[in-house]
Amino acid sequence: MRVFLTGGSGFVGTAVIEELVARNHSVNALVNRHGLNAGGGAVREVKGSLFDPAALDEGMRGCDAVIHLVGIIMEKCSRGVTFERIHYRGTISVVDAARRNGVRRFVHMSALGARPDAVSEYHKTKYRAEQYLRGSSLEWTIIRPSLIHGPGGEFMRMEAMWARKRAPFPVGFMPFMPYFGAGKLGFGGAGKLQPVYVKDVARAFVDALDNRRTVGEVYLLGGPDQLTWPQLHRTVGQAVVGKRRWVMPIPVWAGKLYAAIGVAPLLGFNRDQVIMSQEDNTADITKFRQDFGWDPQPFEPALREYARQL
């Protein structure tokens, strides 16, 4: 099968390319500024952006399927990089190109928590993108992962940095591993996560391509472990530095204040992430297990596979 892929130079995209190539699929990967980190000569790079119809047409020509992965965690409004533009309008552009080029199979990356009444713009725009795809005539599958972990991902890079008592420049030093908690002092609790290994996410996307049971379906995807933020931090600390690190909450109100005054990026977060941290990002993945026929890996054993790379 020849597959057109967006987001191929990213964290998840790199893993998906490796999985596609390992299964002898041919790949046309849309590449903007950054080159690919996987695939070698087995992948054809197509220069362009989500909003370049000529590049999309060139990349999709002769393809049997599209895997659309592009997404952002933080906005850069001064550069026009917003959730609305990338998640929603970018998806419209790719879906329209698939229809225009007769590529009917479309596997789409969304996010666990995407819904019309979401508290964050991140999830709202993910849901709107889903709705546009669902209204098309394409043979679509939507996958909504929880937090994706693995080597090369920004989240685990930050986790490892905190485990080593470091923080992004110019802060430099972080004596504890932080999370956002409710209440005046932050000890009022926070949401749970269901981390899923990037290799399992890649496997799911490639499996979906020729699994007819998945057409017209939305899948929630997470690992078997539902963890609080302190549990996740301590597990990472143990794997990375050999001991459980000190974990401390930052009150939600303080996180929002830091975001408002521009300090948050120095600590590696934004306002939407503060808001989302208070919700459970967990799901029942029974439907995924039934239709895909396998279980995602637990967090700690998967983490130990790559902890030395962090």
Go through each PLM region and give its residues:
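A conserved pocket-lining segment of Rossmann-fold NAD(P)-dependent short-chain dehydrogenase/reductase
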Residues: M161-V196, D200, A204-A208, R212-V215
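Conserved catalytic-site region of short-chain dehydrogenase/reductase
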Residues: E75, L112-Y122, I148-G153
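N-terminal Rossmann NAD(P)H-binding glycine-rich loop of SDR-like oxidoreductase domains
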Residues: M1-H25
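Short alpha-helix in the Rossmann-fold core of NAD(P)-dependent oxidoreductases
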Residues: E84-T91, V107, K126, Q194
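Mid/C-terminal beta-alpha module of Rossmann-like enzyme folds, strongest
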Residues: R2, A202-F269, A283-L310
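Conserved beta-loop-beta element that borders a ligand/cofactor-binding pocket
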Residues: Q131-M161, V171, F176
